[in-house]
């Protein structure tokens, strides 16, 4: 059986990237929550 995680940076950024987060209201909320929490990385 093959592993489920096959790393791919392009797919990672397309699905979980900063620009994708900024597109929707809830995505922006995610970024703001992570900023408030003091996360070093806000998104993929």
From Swiss-Prot:
HAMAP family to which the protein is assigned, alphabetical: Ribosomal_bL34 (MF_00391)
Name of the featured protein: Large ribosomal subunit protein bL34
Presence of keyword Transferase: no
GO biological process, one term: translation
GO cellular component, one term: ribonucleoprotein complex
Family: Belongs to the bacterial ribosomal protein bL34 family.
Matching NCBIfam families: rpmH_bact
Repeat in keyword set: no
Molecular function terms, GO-annotated: structural constituent of ribosome
Annotated Pfam families: Ribosomal_L34 (PF00468)
Protein keywords: Ribonucleoprotein, Ribosomal protein
InterPro entries: Ribosomal_bL34 (IPR000271), Ribosomal_bL34_CS (IPR020939)
